[in-house]
Amino acid sequence: MNSMEFPFLDRTTPNSVISTTLNDLSNWSRLSSLWPLLYGTSCCFIEFASLIGSRFDFDRYGLVPRSSPRQADLILTAGTVTMKMAPSLVRLYEQMPEPKYVIAMGACTITGGMFSTDSYSTVRGVDKLIPVDVYLPGCPPKPEAIIDAITKLRKKVSREIYEDRTESQQENRCFTTNHKFHLGRSTRAVNYDQGLLYQSTSTSEIPSEAFFKYKSSVSSHELVN
């Protein structure tokens, strides 16, 4: 056990009783029990086949892939996220129990990739929909890079204070109204227009076609520009 990561765990009494804080104990218990939900939409997702195999064996980190968001505390997004898929991703994130984490894997997930140059339906970065903890660039990232990202996330978990994380996730929650297309004079066929609507209800109570959620207070056109 690393005393640098958990300084309170190094205090022992003559009877060899460890004294610590509830926060450090909770973080330590979650280090080896991160259960990921694998969310893949394109080619980067194929790297998980190598990662799960015997050569890299990411089970040694306590990672157990789950098919239900209610059983997962980590979601790995890989591939391009379109406007049509964005509500589904937001809903999956909302259904995950706290504390929860996000790893954005690949150029398409982080920036929209090559599909973002002339596409009106590609989200320019998954961090406009959900908060991202670790960015993993690459096209596609190698399995070694994915393991490095998981290691960095584990270090973040070990230093985390749960109350601070909960407060930070409640800020800058923003939704958008229905999407509308308008004819423009540019060379492109249509211009994408969205209106903003601040709400306090959860996404599970709103129709999926009626909103998009992203992390910071950005203008609506930044989803696609």
Swiss-Prot record:
Family according to the record: Belongs to the complex I 20 kDa subunit family.
UniProt KW Manganese keyword: no
GO MF: 4 iron, 4 sulfur cluster binding; iron ion binding; NADH dehydrogenase (ubiquinone) activity; quinone binding
Name of protein: NAD(P)H-quinone oxidoreductase subunit K, chloroplastic
Function of the molecule: NDH shuttles electrons from NAD(P)H:plastoquinone, via FMN and iron-sulfur (Fe-S) centers, to quinones in the photosynthetic chain and possibly in a chloroplast respiratory chain. The immediate electron acceptor for the enzyme in this species is believed to be plastoquinone. Couples the redox reaction to proton translocation, and thus conserves the redox energy in a proton gradient.
Entry GO CC: chloroplast thylakoid membrane; respiratory chain complex I
Disulphide linkage map: none
Endpoints of the signal sequence: none
Gene Ontology process terms (BP): aerobic respiration; electron transport coupled proton transport; photosynthesis, light reaction
Subunit structure: NDH is composed of at least 16 different subunits, 5 of which are encoded in the nucleus.
Keywords: 4Fe-4S, Chloroplast, Iron, Iron-sulfur, Membrane, Metal-binding, NAD, NADP, Plastid, Plastoquinone, Quinone, Thylakoid, Translocase, Transport
Reactions catalysed, as given in the entry: a plastoquinone + NADH + (n+1) H(+)(in) = a plastoquinol + NAD(+) + n H(+)(out); a plastoquinone + NADPH + (n+1) H(+)(in) = a plastoquinol + NADP(+) + n H(+)(out)
Cofactor note text: Binds 1 [4Fe-4S] cluster.
Major localisation: plastid
EC number: 7.1.1.-
Protein's cellular compartments: Plastid, Chloroplast thylakoid membrane
Binding site for [4Fe-4S] cluster: 43-44, 108, 139
Keyword Chaperone: no
Cofactor: [4Fe-4S] cluster
Membrane topology of the entry: Peripheral membrane protein
